[in-house]
Amino acid sequence: MELRVLAVGDVVGEGGLQCLEQHLRSLKKLYRIDFCVVNGENASGTGLTPKQADRMLDAGADILTLGNHSFDRREICAYLDDCPYILRPANLLPSLPGRGFGTFETKIGPVGIVNLLGRCNLDFRPDNPFRVIDKVLKELDGLPVLLDFHAEATSEKLAMAYYLDGKISAQWGTHTHVQTADEQILPKGTGYLTDLGMTGPVHSVIGVKPEQSIANFRGELTSRYEPAAGPCMLAGAVFTIDAQSRHLSLIHISEPTRQAEIS
């Protein structure tokens, strides 16, 4: 028996959210998906509201993961404690709302899902993810584990993947909003993709209005970034896990769709 997991890249803005609502169920049917994990931390541009979380779960996501914008929308804080299907990075302070990993029932039995935040080139430094994952894996002992590593640096993501090779079933990256083409199965059986990409506006600079990004690089930006308008795409990857080996047997990059549009 095998488990087919669809991991969807960062949902950006209302356009990305509508794209997810319009296409997720058909993609799940097309790829015969058993379990779906969606990174939702940019649904508000930066951050996530309870209403947006509910919309993504209603659209077909089983689990939502977050990242460095986990608490940008204060109204999500209480919701993180109440909803077991949303994970914020496990290497944030334990006193903060929510949880960073969990065990979830699937057709092959319980599976561990973990959310971690990288430390390179980010505005703040969470606890060391390499040390935190050691503690998490002890609690998830014996289970297939899937990791969303929300990080900026490719080197940090690759180092984590080789550190966990043979210890978890798969690791995918989020945060950069650019899908990579380096899908691979590492020597000891762990599946890896540096970044899933984003679910959001095509004609944008990683999801935001190009003119705002240009102004920023010219040293002229005076307003907050806003998600771009126009056609959107959904990006992610399908991971197929064999129940006996509990390691990845196949990676397939899901085909983007550009039919959703928000103006």
Which residues does each predicted region cover?
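Single conserved hydrophobic/aromatic residue that forms the stacking wall/gate
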Residues: 251-263
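Binuclear metal-dependent hydrolase catalytic cores centered on His/Asp/Glu-rich metal-binding motifs
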Residues: 26-27, 97-144
